[in-house]
Amino acid sequence: DITSKFLIPEESKSSAYIICKEQNGAVLSGIDIARYIIEELGGSIEFNKIKNDSEDLNYFDKICTMSGSTQILLIMERIYLNFLQHMSGIATYTKKFSSIASEYNVKIADTRKTKPGLRKIEKYAVLCGGGFNHRFGLFDGILIKDNHIFAAGGIKEAIDKIRNRVPHQLKIEVEVKDWKELGEAIKSNADIIMLDNMELSMIKESVKVIRESLGSRCKIEVSGGISLASLEEICKTGIDIISVGAITHSAPAVDFSLEFE
């Protein structure tokens, strides 16, 4: 930070705080990462946390205070604010979905549509917003998608092959997009059926058919094109899970500001 080095003496000390500048409020995520950046990477900065991750924030709420080298506070400013803005943005956007879905006992889950290198913190931010984590990668859950179905020769063939090899504790989820695939998934006793990019009317009928055939043993997930506007009507259909890629890849950043005192 050549600007700070030219303007501010090395021995200068200051006190500062970070405030939320979202007029409609936000959900905090990333405060401990900010503390790590400041304390571990920034040298002898004293950091005091005021708010915790997952807490609701109001406009102008202070989330922490800091004191120490003026140069270090300014050099590190954009780094820790970027993490706070991004992670709190995900938590805040997730909360908008989860607060509606929870009224119907429906879980909002994330996807693998995350920024390269940031999946762990983005999925943590989803938890801060009341959401749930879907698979972290391709190693911790079985999800048979359209290309798997094509490669295996059909849903029944795919499920049979996996069932013969899968550890007993792993559930088998299959993605379906039409009536034919839904029928195959039901006949194959899939543990979880994902209804992919279906119209509301088809979701309703699909839920009815699944419940009549498999009862509540089979979990029903909906995915594809879910928005806040369509969310409540989808929740009313009796599904269990809605996976929303937008909560990680399209969440608006939350505005935070560093202020000196």
Residue ranges, per PLM feature:
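Acidic/glycine-rich phosphate/pyrophosphate-binding loops and surrounding catalytic core
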Residues: 1-188, 192, 201-209, 221, ...
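A short helix->loop->beta-strand "cap" motif at the edges of active sites that frequently abuts
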Residues: 214-218
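Periplasmic-binding protein-like
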Residues: 224
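Glycine/alanine-rich phosphate-binding loops at beta-alpha junctions
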Residues: 198
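Cys/His-rich Zn2+-binding cysteine-cluster or related metal-binding knuckle/ribbon modules and their
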Residues: 228
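Active-site loop ensemble at the mouth of alpha/beta enzyme cores that anchors a bound cofactor
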Residues: 257-261
